[in-house]
Amino acid sequence: MTITPQNLIALLPLLIVGLTVVVVMLSIAWRRNHFLNATLSVIGLNAALVSLWFVGQAGAMDVTPLMRVDGFAMLYTGLVLLASLATCTFAYPWLEGYNDNKDEFYLLVLIAALGGILLANANHLASLFLGIELISLPLFGLVGYAFRQKRSLEASIKYTILSAAASSFLLFGMALVYAQSGDLSFVALGKNLGDGMLNEPLLLAGFGMMIVGLGFKLSLVPFHLWTPDVYQGAPAPVSTFLATASKIAIFGVVMRLFLYAPVGDSEAIRVVLAIIAFASIIFGNLMALSQTNIKRLLGYSSISHLGYLLVALIALQTGEMSMEAVGVYLAGYLFSSLGAFGVVSLMSSPYRGPDADSLFSYRGLFWHRPILAAVMTVMMLSLAGIPMTLGFIGKFYVLAVGVQAHLWWLVGAVVVGSAIGLYYYLRVAVSLYLHAPEQPGRDAPSNWQYSAGGIVVLISALLVLVLGVWPQPLISIVRLAMPLM
């Protein structure tokens, strides 16, 4: 197949990020300069974001059988790039106090972003697997980047071993699907899986093993055991990337697979997914109740958020509203998580020991950093799904989709899970306004709001509030991504 100029325009974000990887590599080889390499990375990611406008002008098209570039791909590429940009921004002040090599951090984030973009455009099980590996392998290094701290190294080893096991399940599942269907393209799978073929034992086993592999990457129950330990052990900026870009890219490609190949038409697969969604919502929220570590708490809460999203995925066959619900929910989850992890990143630095992730570190934050405490409060309220925040809009969409698809027991789980979540999110918010301890442990820099990371946190808070009151611009963008499927 010949690559045309139009194809190259469609692949601009992928090409720009790939070129940035090469430039940063050469820059590191030439001269180690933290500021220079951080700047090059941020310029590359911003250029990739801007290039999405040109991709939109080119229109939807298939670029080789492995990738399809359309509105859906553009939406998820944009979300991945925003998350990667925020990660680099939060990492800069964190790395300033890091005594070992700093520059490779940006290289690993860029390679992981490349994997996320590939997943957003994936239209084939081969590109799905390649994208997942491209996003996972750099994360092994990123999670253990603060390797002189025992927790970080332990988290990296745990994530590496379990991720390798999950990848083998995913690959074996794909092999079984190929053995039965004779094709790996999403569109071809949709054509080949008609007439009750989905009930074939080999196909059910294949998709079952793929659910195990993807369930691990999305940290769904019962494949979630790595999540709290890795979130706690990883540096705060890396936890940001794990919670946002990684989850968004993988969930986006799963959505496309379910849309083209009627996987959800199988009653057995629907039941399994419904049980996983129910368990993720209830278990994730219950386990978060007892946490005194903010990163562990956010890790468990991310399990429940992916459970809410699964409700919309199960209802995908009932109408386009499910796609809209997932797009809006993921945007809300992205900005809320960026704000929450951004505050943790601003409060942390490697030369002061482990991250400021204990709930006690945030007690009375309002009395000496009022704006930072207000931002953290907004993020907690949004993650809890309180009205007037973007998190509420996303949760309302998920409930509406569940009701439309008559998934009553899952709707009940969402309501109960949200009620439980309200308790532990408010516990974090309330602790910010208690009397500060006589000897406060950690603190953000006095000029935090003028740093790039501080600006990202403030913009995230502003978007969560503005789009929570007036969500129409976001809904319009998400709807633009749908007709091009």
Swiss-Prot record:
The UniProt record lists the keyword Translocase: yes
Catalytic activity from the UniProt record: a quinone + NADH + 5 H(+)(in) = a quinol + NAD(+) + 4 H(+)(out)
A biological-process GO annotation: ATP synthesis coupled electron transport
GO cellular component: plasma membrane
Cellular localisation: Cell inner membrane
PANTHER family cross-referenced by the UniProt entry: NADH DEHYDROGENASE
Subunit structure, interactors included: NDH-1 is composed of 13 different subunits. Subunits NuoA, H, J, K, L, M, N constitute the membrane sector of the complex.
Protein name, UniProt field: NADH-quinone oxidoreductase subunit N
Organism: Shigella flexneri
Lineage: Bacteria, Pseudomonadati, Pseudomonadota, Gammaproteobacteria, Enterobacterales
Gene: nuoN
